[in-house]
Amino acid sequence: MSIIVTGAAGFIGSNLLQALNRRGETDIIAVDDLTDGEQFRNLADADIADYLDQNDFLERYARGDFGTVRALFHQGACASTLESNGRYMMENNYRYSCRLLESSLELGVPFLYASSAAVYGSGRTFREARQYERPLNVYGYSKFLFDQRVRRALPQARSQVVGLRYFNVYGPREEHKGRMASVAYHCYQQLRRDGRVELFGEHGGFPPGGHLRDFVAVEDVARVNLHFFDHPQRSGIFNLGSGQARTFNEVALAVINSVRANADQPPLSLQQAVESGLLGYREFPESLRARYQSHTCADLELLREAGYRDDFQSLEEGVAGYCRWLARSA
């Protein structure tokens, strides 16, 4: 009786593998596209039963080749909010997901998939309801449209279907994402490379470094996925963030002070970090002005109603642990 994880060599998928392994789960089929061969590193320390290319997997899954499947965690997608090829995005994120959903419903396999806070666009209300969903780019639209497909399927579904709208996830195993890696990752790399961190300046009424996001540690994301795995009677679409909006300045300062703590140096205030030259700002990119989420904050009411009671790591806790992991991995 296997568990299947798509996007298994990716950021969240590989952390989910680790969380499953810690539970003693090893009968896992990992599915991904290893065209970028370096991503094998995210699989190298995981215990799995098999690996399949994402295209080979699709047909075999539809045929029921894998016998009894305990759950399918669908984490595979193009996650770039800057991707402009709509045909590629819709085929990879929407059509592929639709095929997996249809097969899962036919086979009676619990289907837990990655949605995104990008569906909310520039709104100020982040609640799982149609009137608040206004994506700003084709990535957000691909996630939005699949969520609509799921909403239509849920009333007739005889097996679990869960969509988790990830907010700004950060943590280990994301370095392959390049520009799409988290703010915390880029702050750490800038500090190590240049001796300082540089953030976006003022935009949309927000001061330099003052844009607000809901940053959530990847370990918490894995735990929420496993909560729904443990409760297959619960279905729906749920926000997955910390429930708190924090500024980019706070992320940068958490990174700076985590690195300083590891070097037995005292913490700095934001003003001290700026005055010492450890933190600076650059002009907000013109190319992002029309499609940038300046503020996100997950409404967790539905998630709590679904029985998830654990606290989320604070930004300072999560970033400190992440910086220690990055230092060990250097």
Swiss-Prot record:
Entry's Gene Ontology BP terms: ADP-L-glycero-beta-D-manno-heptose biosynthetic process; lipopolysaccharide core region biosynthetic process
EC number of this enzyme: 5.1.3.20
Gene Ontology molecular function: ADP-glyceromanno-heptose 6-epimerase activity; NADP binding
Cofactors named for this entry: NADP(+)
Entry annotation: catalytic residues: 139, 177
Disulfide topology: none
Pfam families: Epimerase
Family annotation (InterPro entries): Epimerase_deHydtase, Heptose_epim, NAD(P)-bd_dom_sf
Superkingdom of the source species: Bacteria
Swiss-Prot/TrEMBL catalytic activity: ADP-D-glycero-beta-D-manno-heptose = ADP-L-glycero-beta-D-manno-heptose
Keyword NADP: yes
Keywords of the record: Carbohydrate metabolism, Isomerase, NADP
Domain comment in the entry: Contains a large N-terminal NADP-binding domain, and a smaller C-terminal substrate-binding domain.
Role description: Catalyzes the interconversion between ADP-D-glycero-beta-D-manno-heptose and ADP-L-glycero-beta-D-manno-heptose via an epimerization at carbon 6 of the heptose.
Subunit record text: Homopentamer.
Protein known as: ADP-L-glycero-D-manno-heptose-6-epimerase
Gene: hldD
